[in-house]
A protein has these predicted regions:
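A gly/proline- and charged-residue-enriched helix-loop-helix capping module
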Residues: 124-128
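N-terminal secretory/targeting leader peptides
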Residues: 2-122, 132, 141-334
């Protein structure tokens, strides 16, 4: 019960003593669930949206239906940047946003966007599900956000119009990247030229030879049809950038006032829904890769010697994070 509800009840007490029948509306009001909003910018059938629904179901179960979470998918409540701002002021209760958006507010989070940071997905989850991941989530407190759990957003690789088998073949190519200084710096470090192209126009840019290639994960490569115009896939797996499930501080306070156990219930539900999202994403990613290989896409996988060349090429980017070298070492030794 919130302080406001308690004051209302105390104020109404004398009247209730005289007319007992007046107690019924108050009792009914207490039984109404707390309605909360979850913002998701992906469509309903996307892994993150399905995980959001799983989170909502878990919350209802674990709170005995005292808390109901409504999921708004398809960016119905706004784009990610807008959602972050709404959460900071309590306008949205929960969401899932990309790490790159959060790094705009907290530069230290950019460490997690460094290329070739992890050897594989298992290492990334050891880091993020451990004490290091908790440290990064705690950084969000200073942004008036509460970090709940880590979602998977896949691993990104290059794909091109002409065959690329290693670092030498990338030299001088024009590669479309996200609007991110980190991504542009990576392309330059690898000897190519970064290009900013609206995502929906990448297919046309590849088709018209305005760019030589792009980079993304397997599902996006398949869904956007980029394999039709860039059939050479260089599986270098340069970045594994997670996404974050968030709560607003205001809603966590509201939940604590309703029941002191509810904030931890929310955190537990978030962790469970994150596992659901990762499983859904892994299946989606594996299916997309399998489909592409069946279509005859030329896939080049790097041997250890060539991987070492790629890592050496981006070392200047790591040098810029010398102040966080100890943290980087902890990540790479996990």
């Amino acid at each position: 019960m919130t302080r406001r509800q308690l004051l209302r009840l105390l104020t109404a007490a004398p009247a209730l003593a005289v007319t007992g029948c007046a107690a019924q509306p108050a009792s009914s009001q207490q039984e109404k669930p707390l309605i909360l909003r979850y913002a998701e910018n992906q469509p309903e059938d996307y892994p993150t949206s399905k995980a959001a629904k799983a989170f909502a179901e878990l919350v209802a179960q674990r709170t005995n239906n005292k808390v109901k979470v409504l999921v708004y998918s398809g960016a119905e409540l706004g784009a990610e940047q807008s959602i972050i701002q709404q959460m900071q002021f309590g306008g949205v209760d929960f969401s899932r946003v990309s790490l790159s958006q959060l790094a705009e507010y907290e530069p230290e989070l950019s460490v997690l966007q460094l290329p070739y940071l992890y050897s594989d997905a298992q290492q990334m989850w050891r880091v993020l599900d451990g004490s290091i991941g908790d440290e990064f989530l705690a950084m969000l407190d200073g942004m008036d956000l509460v970090g709940l759990s880590w979602f998977d957003a896949g691993v990104r690789s290059f794909y091109t119009r002409e065959k690329v088998t290693g670092l030498d073949d990338l030299q001088g190519l024009t590669i479309r990247v996200q609007e991110s200084d980190m991504m542009s710096d990576m392309i330059i470090a690898l000897g190519a030229k970064p290009a900013q192209v609206v995502y929906s126009k990448v297919y046309a840019a590849l088709h018209n030879a305005e760019i030589d290639g792009a980079e993304n994960n397997w599902p996006s490569y398949e869904v956007m049809g980029h394999y039709e115009v860039a059939p050479f896939f260089l599986k270098d797996e340069h970045t594994r950038v997670p996404e974050v499930q968030l709560a607003s501080p205001a809603v966590m306070e509201k939940l604590a006032a309703l029941d002191e156990s509810f904030p931890e219930v929310i955190r537990a539900c978030a962790r469970e829904s994150a596992q659901t999202e990762r499983e859904l994403w892994a299946r989606r990613e594996a299916n997309a890769e399998q489909n592409m290989r069946k279509r005859g896409i030329c896939v080049t996988e790097l041997d250890e010697a060539e991987k070492a060349r790629f890592r050496a090429a981006v070392q200047p980017m790591y040098d810029e994070f010398s102040a966080q070298q100890e943290l980087i070492d902890r990540i790479q030794k996990s």
